[in-house]
Amino acid sequence: MSDDLVKILVLGPSKSGKSTVTNFLAGTRDTPTKEYHETNPLRVLEVEIALDDTRRSGRQAAGLKKAVVQLWDVGGSSKHQAGWPAIASNADGIIYVFNPEVKGSEKELLLWYKNFALNQDELDDDNNFKMRVTDGHSLIFSHHSSLPEFAVGDNAIPPMPKQLQGIRALETSLDYQSDNFKEAFDALVEQIIASRLAAEENDLLQKEREAKDYPRLKR
């Protein structure tokens, strides 16, 4: 296999910079403008990411050179909530985006976490909603779309709600102080691919073991 498809959702409140982040990660940065355009209800952009063979070993490294990433930029309005389960289906990763200049906006990410990271149609053995997308396959972007006035320095990333504290959070911006979120995005894709290939390899090994045991069972 020469490539693989990865589906990553970009979620968060309206006017948080999701489309700007999506365009940048897809290699199509916007022309600077102060005019707001609502995403209604969804955009899907694709980008190819080169994969680092040195991060994989054995069968995992064979032939896989790139991943095709679909970035699903989901509108921040809840008026399309009825369609969210369909959007969430088969998601591999999530990027949560919020504006730290808006007080309490990080708490709004809980709505997106509960509706997309959790599968509310299935329960686990402890009677909790099953995880659709794990924390390790997610990122949080504290995104500055304009010159930061309040959220700077140690306050750039406010404390996350308890349910989101296991997700890596970064300070992001295209024009102001920012962590290297493109590098974090590439690493996220690598992690998703590595987890997928490890699961496929384990499944193949299990089938090989079962095939070896089958003649013994017949005797």
Curated annotation (Swiss-Prot):
Q: What gene name does this entry carry?
A: IFT22
Q: Which UniProt keywords apply?
A: Cell projection, Cilium, Cytoplasm, Cytoskeleton, Flagellum, GTP-binding, Nucleotide-binding
Q: Where in the cell is it found?
A: Cytoplasm, Cytoskeleton, Flagellum basal body; Cell projection, Cilium, Flagellum
The biological process GO terms on file are: cilium assembly; intracellular protein transport
Q: Which Pfam families match?
A: Roc (PF08477)
> Which GO molecular function annotations are given, in alphabetical order?
GTP binding; GTPase activity
For this protein, the record's Gene3D superfamilies field holds: P-loop containing nucleotide triphosphate hydrolases (3.40.50.300)
Q: What is its main location?
A: cytoplasm
Task: Name the coiled-coil region(s).
Answer: none
Source taxon at top rank: Eukaryota
Family statement drawn from the similarity comment of this UniProt entry: Belongs to the small GTPase superfamily. Rab family.
The protein here is known as Intraflagellar transport protein 22
Which Gene Ontology cellular-component terms appear in the entry? Answer: ciliary basal body; cilium; cytoplasm; endomembrane system; intraciliary transport particle B; motile cilium
Cytoplasm among keywords:
yes
Q: What does this protein do?
A: Required for flagellum formation.
Q: Does the keyword Phosphoprotein apply?
A: no
Q: Provide the residue positions that the database annotates as binding GTP.
A: 12-19, 72-79
